[in-house]
């Protein structure tokens, strides 16, 4: 549990209910979320933007788009509840916006798991200024 708290602290600046998001990624992928996704590609982590480099990076792009659609909540501060039940994420009974945030994070963690085979270690600490602008909109 202490390691997950450290993960949450290291993710400061990344949108969302950080502690829960970090746990979801760890549970779904078995990977350390900060080390493996904190600066991955063009769209993961703080300041991410640009044309996705691969399917893993596209997960981050879609996640940011999902957050842009949230209503009446602060994706940087509000916290939601969820459970890890039978190796599946189950969002708890939350207020509407926090429920939406939980669903965004759940879809993101599942997307990362489903695209583990595209994960490219050379994109792990990718320099954002080298990312090409994308015409793709949310």
UniProtKB/Swiss-Prot annotation:
UniProt-annotated site: Hydrophobic membrane-disruption site (MDiS), residues: 127
Places the protein is found: Secreted
Presence of the UniProt keyword Cytoplasm in the record: no
Keyword field contains Secreted: yes
Residues flagged as site, Cationic membrane-docking site (MDoS): 128, 133
Ranges where the record places region Important for membrane-damaging activities in eukaryotes and bacteria: 121-133
Membrane-traversing stretches: none
PROSITE patterns xrefs: PA2_ASP (PS00119), PA2_HIS (PS00118)
Alphabetically ordered keywords of this record: Disulfide bond, Myotoxin, Secreted, Signal, Toxin
Signal peptide: 1-16
Main location: secreted
Gene3D superfamilies from the UniProt entry: Phospholipase A2 domain
Function of the molecule: Snake venom phospholipase A2 homolog that lacks enzymatic activity. Is myotoxic. Has a strong indirect hemolytic activity and anticoagulant activity. A model of myotoxic mechanism has been proposed: an apo Lys49-PLA2 is activated by the entrance of a hydrophobic molecule (e.g. fatty acid) at the hydrophobic channel of the protein leading to a reorientation of a monomer.
Protein family according to the UniProt entry: Belongs to the phospholipase A2 family. Group II subfamily. K49 sub-subfamily.
Protein name in UniProt: Basic phospholipase A2 homolog acutohaemolysin
Phylogenetic lineage: Eukaryota, Metazoa, Chordata, Craniata, Vertebrata
């Amino acid at each position: 549990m202490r390691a997950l708290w450290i993960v949450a602290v290291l993710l400061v600046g990344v949108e969302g209910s950080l502690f829960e998001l970090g746990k979801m990624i760890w549970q779904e992928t078995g990977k350390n979320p900060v080390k493996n996704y904190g600066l991955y590609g063009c769209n993961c982590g703080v300041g991410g933007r640009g044309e996705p480099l691969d399917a893993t990076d596209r997960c981050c792009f879609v996640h940011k788009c999902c957050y842009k659609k949230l209503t009446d909540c602060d994706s940087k501060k509000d916290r939601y509840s969820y459970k890890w039940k039978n190796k599946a994420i189950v969002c708890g009974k939350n207020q509407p916006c926090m429920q939406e945030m939980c669903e965004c994070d759940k879809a993101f963690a599942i997307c990362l798991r489903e695209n583990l085979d595209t994960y490219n270690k050379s994109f792990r600490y990718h320099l954002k200024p080298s990312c090409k602008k994308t015409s793709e909109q949310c």
